[in-house]
Amino acid sequence: MKKLIILIFSLLITFNVLANDWPHQNISKAVFALDIKDRAPINIIEELDNSLGKIYFFTNIRNLQGQRVTHRWIYKNKVMADVVFDVGGPRWRVWSSKNLWPTWIGVWSVEVLSADGEVLYQKEFNYNK
């Protein structure tokens, strides 16, 4: 019995450590990338040169099956796009993309919203000259 309790305690600590590495309790990964291949982000970035006109936002969603999430693209406090996803399983990978004009330089953000509009996570990137 003592060994079982130690095992359970160890597993709980391990899970807690892993969960704390996630950006949000329901988001295990959220990154900007230059491309998506085989449902995975390729060339993860934090900023983008304005000679490149497209960026992807990839999110690995956990334990929200049956719910909807939205990627909301924001530039200069203006909503530029909402992309809605239906989450079909306990681990669901989604991504959206945005075509960018070279003049739209500055800080962009993407919010990951729950179905009721709660911001689950927000991430920024710089679009530079």
Regions found by a protein language model. Give the residues of each.
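Extracellular Ig-like/FN3 beta-sandwich strand-entry sites
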Residues: G66, T103-V107
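Short, exposed beta-strand-loop hairpins at the edges of beta-sheets
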Residues: L100-W101, S109-Y127
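Conserved aromatic beta-strand anchor motif in extracellular beta-sandwich/beta-rich domains
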Residues: H71-Y75, V112
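Short edge beta-strand/loop segments characteristic of extracellular beta-sandwich folds
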Residues: K54-R62
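Aromatic sugar-binding surface patches on proteins
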Residues: G88-S97
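Positively charged n-region of N-terminal signal peptides that target proteins for export
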Residues: M1-L4
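Short, compositionally biased P/S/T/A/G/V-rich stretches that sit at domain boundaries
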Residues: N20-S51
